[in-house]
Amino acid sequence: MRDIASVGLTSREACGDTVRNVQGCHLAGACPYEILDISAWAEAAHQHFLRHPLGQRLPRKFKINFSGCATDCGQAMFNDVGVIAAARQHDDGSVEAGFRVFVAGGLGANPHPALALEAFTPREE
């Protein structure tokens, strides 16, 4: 285990009631339909929750997923928090890239897609 820890890996969040591995679309950075490469946001979420003490006191496992386009290859719609890159057009014709954030999705005993938290979230937020 020391050797594994020495290269930055851990088994701490592998099971139990914690934030699981933050996941993202397998085509991130290469998808022709991608609005944003979600890799940096997925990595930031991963780093925030990795070994975070709050993560060990959750009532159930907690899953976070990012997708770079509306195709949702990452299946963000079926996770506790799903973030899908989106774009909106302003009145002046300019296009702003950001996200649609979804919550409370799941594939358990009663599968259900996530609910939209808000219509659009700017990427700076």
Which positions does each model-derived feature cover?
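Small-residue-enriched alpha-helical segments and adjacent helix-cap loops
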Residues: 1-96
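Internal alpha/beta scaffold segment
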Residues: 107-125
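FAD-binding subdomain of flavoenzyme oxidoreductases
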Residues: 76, 97-105, 113-116
